[in-house]
Amino acid sequence: MHSINKLLSGALGLALGCALPALHAEEKTLRLYNWADYFAEDTLARFTAETGIKVIYDVMDGSETLEAKMLAGGSGYDLIFPGDTVAERLMRAGSLQPLDRSKLTALDDIEPGLQKLRTHYEFSRQATVPYTWGTIGLTYNAEQIKQRLPDAPVNSLDMLFKPELAAKFADCGISMIDSPDEVLAVVLNYLGREPRSAKPEDLAAASELLLKLRPYIRKFQSQPVTDLVNGNLCLSLGYSGDMTQAQRTADSAGKNTLFQYRIPREGTTVWMDTMAIPVDAKHPEYAYAFINFVMRPQNMAAISNFTGYPTSNAKARASVDETMRNNPDIYLDEATYARLIPGKDIPQPDMRARMRTWTKFKTATAK
């Protein structure tokens, strides 16, 4: 994610406020910390116009940075957007406020499938509201895959994890999300093993599979959209939103390219980004106002349409772009939800063991 700051309060107004404190009441300001470009283009401006609360939007460059800021305390933020497992650790560490449900207006509108997934998070579900979510799966250029393998098993990880099949797509480019936890979970689940395992025998099996694939992996990246659109990649294991963003970009450029996304039949991981209030937030009341504003169906639909990720609000689905709303690999049925692997907080020794497996894979010599 890009590291930029967006200040949605007039510099002149701030200057006057500092110069004439006797004439101005303190300006209402909400400080939030979120990924770049993770709202609709007019979300923040409309919130300010409606409430009079100015928004300072600081953009985080990684979940690790967010977690470090919260654990250190004194961040100055009123609202943050942690991922599900990060929120679990932060709540357990006492860095988040338990939410007052009486101040929230849309908790009953959360997608039922997400409500079930949230039961896996013992601590953070008391302190978070789901924002957007998604899965890890296969985004591919439909024409390029068909040219190379007309009967490609596009709904199966076999297309990537069987070396003899991956080899057929190496010339048009394969990428893999640069996330050891997500990829290893998907690989281990594919092998019939515990997705979050760090047992030596499980990691050895995962390593054996991955090393056979290494010659065919062109890139490790978390944002493959540009390479997909420019024709540098034809197959990517990554976020569900990649397909929507790639298709939108290609259409805007007048390219006659069809991208598709599939959740593998073997199962895959699911993630949720959430909204949470730091324990030392100075203006929690502004945070509640923003959460309620964002969770309105029309606002959540606008965010979903802009970001390419499904909304957490079930009532917003009707206003989401038809291509997303009617895609069963983005808005899921119960059977697909049942194949999803929720996040899990992994102990540090296990994380280090998994990271060693991942590093060995990434640094292995490719063709």
Tell what function each PLM region has:
Residues S9-A19:
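Bacterial N-terminal signal peptides
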Residues L203-L211, K255-A276:
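Periplasmic-binding protein-like
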Residues A87-R218, Q223-V225, V229:
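Extracytoplasmic ligand-binding site segments that recognize negatively charged/polar headgroups
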Residues E26-L90:
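Early extracytoplasmic/lumenal segment of secretory-pathway proteins
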